[in-house]
Every structure is written in C-alpha cells, then in structure tokens.
A protein has these predicted regions:
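Conserved core of the sugar-phosphate nucleotidyltransferase
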Residues: 72, 121-162
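Conserved beta-strand scaffold positions in the cores of enzyme catalytic domains, especially
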Residues: 33, 84-87, 137-139
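Alpha-helix termination/capping residues and helix-transition junctions
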Residues: 4, 27, 51, 106-109, ...
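Conserved N-terminal catalytic core of the sugar/cofactor nucleotidyltransferase
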Residues: 2-12, 39-116, 125-127
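Active-site metal-binding loops of divalent metal-dependent hydrolases
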Residues: 17, 115-119, 143
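Short catalytic helix/loop segments, enriched in acidic residues and glycine
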Residues: 27-43
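Glycine-centered loop/turn positions within well-structured domains
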Residues: 19, 31, 66
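N-terminal nucleotide-binding beta1-loop-alpha1 segment
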Residues: 1-27
Length: 162
C-alpha cells in the first residue's frame, strides 16, 4: 500500500532529445528547459514537487544535460538548500526503463514518485497517492480517443495494464 507520507524522493525523466519539439527548441536546449510563460517547464514540475513536500529530486538526464545542471544552478534551486538534486546522466539514450534502471542505485530506501519531464499533472496528487490500493505500484494516465506512436498504455476492462 502506498501512502503519501512514505514518498521521500521524486524522479524527473528529462533525458529525451525532444525531436517533436525541434521547431520550438531548435535542438539547442532540452525540452524540459523550453519556456512556458516566464519559466522553463521543469521549474513548474519542481514547484509541484515542492508543494508535495518532497525535497530530494533525482534528474534522469541525457541530451544536453549540462544545460539542465547549469540552469538549475543559475536559478538558485541548488544553492538554497531546499532541494537535494541528484543527477543520473545517460551518455547514450536508454529509454524510460533504461533511465530508471540506471538511476536505481541512487534511490534511498523509500517510495518514489516519477514524473515525465515534459508532462504536468493538474490536480491533487496527494489524494491520488493516498488512495487505497492493493498493489505496490500505481500509474496515473489519462484517457484519449486517439493514439500516437508514443506514450500509449493499454488497459483491460478491469483497468489493468495489458
């Protein structure tokens, strides 16, 4: 059973090249650093993580990872002692599962919440996490009537992953 109070760290998957966003990023910045309004997208994720009371963030980086590191330093996230940032950098793209496997040795002995570095979840994450569940892992997805070549999950009528 998961409980929000057991979550001691967040993982942000931000190692992708963002080829679909090349017209916006120009392939010169990682997609998590593309500005939405005044700030890079990753700042909104970090603030959401902060609102959950989580202070340890593992960043699974890859493409242009040094820019993410520098940007977080420049914005003073790393120097204000609010967060402990830990970087797990992929020298070659490993995909989602590969990034998580590479970061596994960095995990401390408590539950984690994983965020995609290009996805913002609007809503009350605390209530979702605290919801009674009989499994050791949960995944929050959204229902769409269309599918793409990426980010698709298939569920049975019982809402179990197929």
């Amino acid at each position: 059973m998961s409980s929000f109070n057991n979550i001691g760290q967040a993982i942000i998957l931000c190692g992708g090249k963002g080829t679909r966003l090349a017209p916006i990023s120009g392939n010169i910045i990682p997609k998590s650093l593309i500005k939405i309004g005044r700030y890079p997208f990753i700042y909104y994720l970090i603030n959401q993580i902060y609102s959950l009371g989580i202070k340890r963030i593992i960043l699974c980086t890859g493409y242009l990872s040094e820019l993410i590191y520098t940007d977080l330093n420049n914005f003073n996230f790393r120097n204000n002692n609010i967060f402990e940032f830990v970087f797990s950098n992929e020298d070659t793209p490993l995909g989602t599962a590969g990034a998580l496997i590479k970061a596994f040795p960095l995990l401390k002995n408590h539950s984690s919440i994983i965020f995609n570095g290009d996805t913002y979840i609007k809503g009350n994450l605390k209530s979702y996490i605290n919801k009674e569940t009989s499994s050791n892992i949960s995944m929050l997805t959204s229902f769409k009537y269309f599918s793409k070549d990426f980010g698709v999950t298939y569920c049975s009528k019982n809402n179990l992953l197929e």
